[in-house]
Swiss-Prot record:
It comes from the Bacteria. This reaction introduces a second double bond into the aromatic ring system. The lineage of its organism: Bacteria, Bacillati, Cyanobacteriota, Cyanophyceae, Synechococcales. This is Chorismate synthase. HAMAP family: Chorismate_synth. It holds the Pfam family Chorismate_synt. Homotetramer. It is an enzyme of class 4 (lyase). Reduced FMN (FMNH(2)).
């Protein structure tokens, strides 16, 4: 329960942070889709731990293994199973915390719900669960690219209180990957890295904001009422670890505008295609994509695991002073960028198949 997402393009993840492996099963991917296996690995490398001085020092190769559903670099139309084996588990880091509820972790709520939790590493609540999502998202990206030349780009817009202004019309993948914090503004990126290092040296952590743009979006994706496109995007992105907020288009800033300021006037584009003069709606109106770029933002809280002393209790109610020893990111945002892209890709691939299935018979 709770480990699957999507209707037609369905993604189910499995595994724990300190178990033997983590993985994913993708169902519903159309057959005969040519798959670039290297691109799956490239996406996993982007979220891999130990990739820079501002990420967790845990060392994992995160090499993907394709178990089924792809042969000779083509999808078969059957379930695609992929796993990544865990290599650098250190359960000893958690031995002293076995019965202790770490502040703002899932330990307490998992205990309240199940009466038991994984003995080390956070179990299903660990960010290693997202390996399966990123692998599935890499396939969804290739599907969207083939059908519509759709491009999904995410980047770090804000770290703590340091924010970058980004021109979403000109930003490219190389700009995002040009530094370890994945902020396309080079000057601001340096300040962000310094801030993460300062906070980390103090044994603390920080959060921030990731922004995402989707270009060449097919019009008509999304369903009325309960399956609105932004509703599914919100569910997908808010299911990522450490997320605390979501907005699309003008978002909360739009609440300060009047209707005359916020409305996106319709204009005729090339070949008389319906366009909008502005894009406060963020490419979605009435829960359905209008063909304009989809623009969204996701807020991430500070990493819950910090080295500072914190007060908590154990399973017997005894007061404990805790200073975590596990290996964790002082800021999750640089590695969360491919996670955001993956979940957006999965949602759009699912809605693309739903749209084609319902509205393309004649």
């Amino acid at each position: 329960m709770g480990s699957s997402f999507g209707d037609l393009f369905r993604v189910s993840t499995f595994g724990e942070s300190h178990g033997g492996s983590v993985g994913v099963i993708v169902e519903g991917c159309p057959p005969r889709l040519e798959i670039d296996l290297e691109k799956i690995q490239e996406e996993l490398d982007r979220r891999r731990p130990g990739q820079s001085k501002i990420t967790t020092p845990r060392k994992e190769l995160d090499q993907v293994e394709i178990l089924s559903g792809i042969a000779n670099r083509e999808t078969l139309g059957t379930p695609i199973a992929m796993i990544v084996r865990n290599r650098d588990q250190r359960p000893s880091d958690y031995k002293e915390m076995k019965n202790i509820f770490r502040p703002s972790h899932a330990d307490g709520t998992y205990h309240l719900k199940y009466g038991i939790q994984a003995p080390s590493g956070g179990g299903r609540a660990s960010a290693r669960e997202t390996i399966g999502r990123v692998a599935a998202g890499a396939i969804a990206k290739q599907l969207l690219q083939k059908v519509q030349n759709t491009q999904i780009l995410a980047w770090v817009k804000r770290i703590h209180n340091i924010e970058a202004e980004i021109d979403i019309n000109t930003i490219g993948f190389a700009d995002i990957e040009s530094n370890i914090v994945r902020c396309p503004n080079q000057d601001v990126a340096k300040l962000m890295i310094q801030r993460i290092e300062e906070i980390s040296r103090d044994g603390d952590s920080c959060g921030g904001l990731i922004e995402c743009v989707v270009r060449n979006v097919p019009a008509g994706l999304g369903m009325p009422v309960f399956d609105k496109l932004e509703a599914d995007l919100s569910k997908a992105l808010m299911s990522l670890p450490a997320t605390k907020g979501f907005e699309v288009g003008s978002g909360f800033r739009g609440t300060f505008l009047k209707g005359s300021e916020h409305n996106d006037a319709f204009i005729a584009g090339d070949k008389n295609r319906l366009r909008t003069a502005t894009n406060n709606s963020g490419g979605i109106q009435g829960g359905i994509s209008n063909g304009e770029p989809i623009i969204l933002r996701v807020g991430f809280k500070p990493t819950a695991t910090i080295r500072k002393d914190q007060q908590t209790i154990d399973s017997e109610g005894k007061q404990i002073t805790l200073a975590s020893k596990g290996r964790h990111d002082p800021c999750v945002l640089p590695r969360a960028v491919p996670m955001v892209e993956a979940m957006v890709s999965i949602v759009l691939a699912d809605h693309l198949l739903r749209q084609r299935g319902q509205c393309s018979l004649w």
